[in-house]
A protein has these predicted regions:
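Short hydrophobic beta-strand element within catalytic cores of glycosyltransferases
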Residues: 357-360
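A charged, aromatic-enriched C-terminal amphipathic alpha-helix characteristic of glycosyltransferases
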Residues: 399-436
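Aromatic "clamp/platform" in nucleotide-sugar-dependent glycosyltransferases that forms part
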Residues: 340
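Membrane-proximal helix-turn-helix segments that form the acceptor-binding/catalytic region
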Residues: 43, 159-197
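Nucleotide-activated donor-binding/catalytic signature segment of Leloir-type glycosyltransferases, i.e.
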Residues: 289-319
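Conserved donor-binding/catalytic core segment of Leloir-type glycosyltransferases
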Residues: 16, 235-254, 260-267, 275-278
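N-terminal subdomain of nucleotide-sugar transferases
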Residues: 1-66, 73-76, 133, 419, ...
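Conserved acidic donor-binding segment of nucleotide-sugar-dependent glycosyltransferases
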Residues: 372-373, 377-384, 393-398
Length: 440
């Protein structure tokens, strides 16, 4: 017997969060570890979970046969059964639609908050209520732009030359991955036009949303960052000299192929240089099974590493918790964000909060908070020579590194930790609800 949440939360504004991965208590329910992505959702929940006058319902899909529900922190956690993986989820499937319809009937939300347009479960949740419940989408990444820039810096000949059996078998070669993003961008357009309300951080993101859904209402809120990063402070004297930390990779958007080309130039001048790469990786696979599982992109990156003999200069850290990430950043000399497209880059913001001197490709919405020569340095994504020069500049100039790192830390801590997610989100929810009442 499923509980009627009306008996628990009748006096509160009820907001249903639709997330593309389990967060908070949902991870415990499904016995899953912390993910390295989506930390802003965890931080937002931590801030909102005890807010007065609002009750959250956190829902995502899982591989199961029945709806699971539990209550924690006074909020509802709902695991929605699915017979499909999140990547192959069909938003038009009658079973999927019926399960989301049950969730809406059970929790009876006043408003639906969709976290990201990346996966089809978001569209399914919106279709399940047929436009009757006001909805808002928090933009995590603009899929149309990710598709446009997916293979930047990798020529078609290299995409073919380094194609692997596993990618051929799975129809997952780089140009096929790019086409999948374009397909997902079509779904993104449906999501934005149905919800008609979006939360963005940058003008770049707002412009992209309006190009897709011209009449959508845009609300601004800065990306919430885990406060654990403010507990660590970069110090020039204590950092590992000539070491670089970067964002987790695994696919071309993150720009590791360009970073490797720049790093090769750095190593010529500083043979002791180290590049630390977080996240799970099959890059240096040695056993037969792991080598057979290597992706085209991993194989392409490894070809650059091997060509320049960088194997001993690269350290794969594996998956890191937020605190481990903060600690590792604080021990490196320089941070580089090399992506070909980013909406806001939480990783870059986290690094700035720690106080490490940073370098970023000039992409997406980064320029909203990142100022060249003041709190960091920009370079064009397809100019690894410039990136290498900027890294070397930091290595050579202690005063510059300390100045840029200190400025970035001061500005980002003031900006991010002055944010009241409670006030921002609740104000947005109330504005959307009031508009909905007026129009209906």
């Amino acid at each position: 017997m499923l509980p009627n949440w009306d008996n628990y939360f009748r006096h509160f504004m009820r907001v249903l969060w639709v997330t593309n991965q389990p967060i908070a208590h949902l991870r415990k329910m499904l016995n899953l570890p912390i993910s390295q992505s989506g930390g802003w959702m965890e931080t937002s929940y931590a801030s909102l979970k005890t807010s007065k006058g609002i009750t959250l319902g956190i829902a995502t899909i899982y591989n199961g046969s029945q709806i699971l529900q539990e209550c924690s922190d006074g909020n509802a956690f709902i695991a929605v059964p699915s017979k499909q993986s999140i990547g192959s989820y069909d938003p038009n499937n009658s079973y999927n639609l019926s399960q989301w319809a049950k969730v809406l009937e059970i929790f009876h939300p006043d408003i639906i908050h969709i976290w990201g347009t990346e996966y089809a479960l978001s569209l399914c949740a919106l279709k399940a209520h047929s436009g009757k419940i006001p909805s808002v989408v928090y933009i995590q990444g603009m899929l149309n732009q990710l598709a446009n820039h997916y293979c930047d810096g990798i020529g078609l000949l290299d995409q073919m030359k380094y194609a692997t059996l596993i990618d051929i078998k799975n129809n997952n070669l780089l140009w096929q991955q790019k086409n999948k993003f374009y397909k997902a961008a079509e779904r993104e357009a449906q999501i934005l036009n149905i919800a008609n309300n979006v939360i963005v951080e940058s003008d770049w993101c707002a412009c992209n949303c309006h190009s897709i859904a011209p009449h959508c209402n845009v609300y601004h809120s800065y990306l919430p960052i885990n406060p654990i990063f403010a507990k660590y402070n970069w110090n020039y004297k204590e950092c590992e000299k000539h070491s670089i930390f970067t964002v987790a990779g695994g696919y071309p958007i993150k720009g590791h192929h360009m970073l490797m080309k720049a790093f090769a130039k750095v190593v010529k001048l500083y043979p002791d240089a180290k590049l630390y790469i977080p996240g799970a990786s099959n890059l240096f696979a040695t056993d037969l099974r792991s080598r057979l599982m290597k992706t085209t992109y991993d194989t392409y990156i490894y070809s650059i590493i091997k060509k320049h003999q960088l194997q001993d200069n690269i350290v794969l850290t594996g998956k890191l918790s937020p605190e481990q990430m903060a600690e590792r950043i604080s021990k490196c000399h320089v941070y580089v964000m090399p992506s070909s497209c980013e909406n806001h880059s939480s990783s870059l913001i986290e690094a700035m909060i720690v106080g490490i001197p940073t370098i970023s490709s000039y992409v997406g919405g980064i320029s909203q908070y990142y100022k060249d020569g003041a709190n960091g340095f920009f370079y064009r994504f397809n100019e690894p020579e410039v990136l290498a020069s900027l890294i070397v500049r930091y290595f050579k100039d202690k005063e510059l590194a300390e100045k840029i790192g200190s400025c970035g830390k001061e500005e980002e801590r003031k900006l991010r930790f002055a944010i009241n997610v409670n006030t921002d989100f609740i104000d947005i929810y109330e504005t959307i609800l009031n508009r909905h009442r007026i129009n209906n």
